[in-house]
Structures are given as structure tokens and as C-alpha cells.
Amino acid sequence: MKNCLNICLPVLFAVFAVALARGQNDQNEIQITRPVSSLGNTRPIPVSIEGFDSEVTAILKFDLYVQGFTFVSPETAQYQISGSSTGSVVGRVVDRFGKKTLFSRSYNGATLRRQAHALTDDIVFAITGKKGIAQTQIAFKVQASNGNGEIYIADFDGHNYQAVTHDGTIVSAPAWAPGRSALYYNSYKRGNPDIFYHNLTTGERDDIAHYTGSNISPAVSPDGSRVAMVMSESGSPNVWVANANGSHPRKLTSTSEDSSPCWSPDGQWICFATKIHERRVLAKVPAGGGEVQVIRTPGTPNPTEPDWSPDGKWIAFTMQAGEFDICVMPADGSAPPVILVRGEDPSWSPNSRTLIYARRTGGHYVLSLLDVYTKQVKDIHQILGSDSEPAWAR
């Protein structure tokens, strides 16, 4: 890492104390307190942008803001970004403090938007040493007022969206297969909550889990060979694992009310939400079967919807104490969770820095991006209806 944001998330956990208090009506009230000690160097990177037209400038600012940058005058910027966008995008980045040019190049692409995204990713890599997210994709659910919905995919900022399904029924929980060529999701297309595999190249799809009861919450292993899911064929909803095509399902848990499985990036563990001794908790189980282990999340009641970061270090999840909040904790449990922002359904970016999540506003859901280090938030381009249950392609 090459700049002022080269800090580790443990700094955040070390300086936040999360206390759980009970109100007079036994209502859970979450209080976040910050000691006098500094949060660490979590300030955004100051950059200036000059020379581009208004469209490209807006794209660059959006892309960079949700990755920890802020915008100042050239005289006060740590990095100066300049260029042009007449016909194609040309960009140059100068380290004003180091007095050197980091790169200068031109871009080709179908649209100025795609060229601007490519420039953003080069800027992020040149300054931070990390891959950017501007050319990534997301999947999500768009729900109409009648409760039916469709699965959509889009660029990470919500642009260039397209519908994957056209079924006019209840859908949920899109999950990407590796390579961004296919999705798994839950659909009532055949009158039962089944899990479908959908090839995005050919448009073909298969109903891979259509057992008696519910078949929901698909999660694909990092190598794409297996899919975890929640099925209630045996009565209680439990975590199962099957081959990618749905064959040879194997029950992994016998706990109560399991939901929202996700994989560790090494494919060795499955994290999920469950109920033990009448309490909602997060737990993990070996992907090949074995003992269920509870993951402690002190100060964050009713945890659910976990997502394991691609670098293996963090678990983001939703907690509920009256309202829904997004939390992040070390995957090894070495520090308590930190409550970051109001929302639900968090999904990690491929570089384990930004979260996309759903937040409720004005009676519907919108998707927002959160830079975990700086807590900078931006709503993505609104699609149609109510947008929720995002999944980031990795």
C-alpha cells in the first residue's frame, strides 16, 4: 500500500466500543462510543480532477468517492488527475508530494463511461496498490409494488442494467458463479421456492433444487464446484451442500431456522445465521461436514445475512435492534463487531474494501455503496421499483 489509507481495519475495531443497553420496555438500544484516542489515518485521499467533460468528471468522482477519495483544488491535492474526453478518454496522474507522474495513457472502449471506469481502476491501483472496482458487476432483486420481482444485473454503479428474469413472480437471493457467466437465485416460477441456475451467455436455466418445502439462499463455492443452500425437506430449514448442478445434496446442519449461508474464500467453511437456545447467532460449519461453531458477535443482537470478505479477513452482517444495521468483524473473532451504517444485505467488493447494501427510504429500498475505511456512502443509480439483495461478482 502506498498512501495515507494504508491502514488495517483492526484500528477501527480497537477504537470503537459497542455497548448493548436494555431500555425500560426491554428494547435493545445500540450505543456506539468513540474514545478520545484517534481512529487512525482513515481520512480520504485528496485528489483534484481537471480537463474532462462533465459526464466523465461525474463518473470519476463517483467511482473514486466510494473507494476512499475526496476532491480538492489542484493546489492542495496530494494527487492531481488531469486529461481530456474528446472522442476518447486520456488521463494523467501526478503525485504532487512526490513530484512525479504515476502514469499517462489513453483509453479505448465502447463508451466514454467504460473508458472512465477503466481510468478509475488505473488511478486506484497506481495510488493504493489495490485493484479498483469500477469495472465490476452486481446482481440484485427489483421488486414491484405487487410483491413480484425480477433478478437484474448491472455495473457496480447501477448503470447498464438488464433484467435476467422475466417471470413476474417472487424471486430472491441472486448469487454469482465464478467468472460472471452465471447466476443462482431463488424463484417461485414453478409455484414453489426453488433454486435455479441461469447461464447468462445462453439464457438457459435449470431448476437445480426443487425438493418438498423451501429451497432458498444459494451460495456458490469460490471454485464454482459446489453450492450451499437452505432446504427444509427434512422439516426445519438447514444448510445443505450439493454439486454445482444440484446433484448429491448433503445436509450439513441440524440446528434451527438456518439462513443466509456464505463461503469462506478458501472454500473450507460455510458461515450462516441460525437459532441456538432461542437466540439468533452466526455460526460456521466445515464445508465437508462437521461440528457447528458459534461465532460470537457481542453487542449486535439478531445477526443475519453474513458475507465473508474475499481476502478472508472480515465478515460483514446485518443486525437488528429495532432497525437494521450493517456490521463488520474480524473473521477470526479477535475483536468485537463494529456497527457501520443503517442497512441490510451487505455484499463485499472483490477487493474487500467496499460494501454494497440495501437501505430503506421512503417506503422502498435503494442500493448504496460504503467505503468501509472512510465511511463514505453513495447511492447507486436507481433502477426500477425497490432494489435489494445485492450480490457483488468476484
Could you describe each region identified by the protein language model?
Residues 8-17:
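Bacterial N-terminal signal peptides
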Residues 76-122:
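Amphipathic beta-strand/beta-sheet edge segments enriched in Tyr/Trp
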Residues 132-134, 178-179, 222-223, 265-266, ...:
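Residue-level detector of Asp-centered blade-edge/turn motifs that repeat once per structural unit
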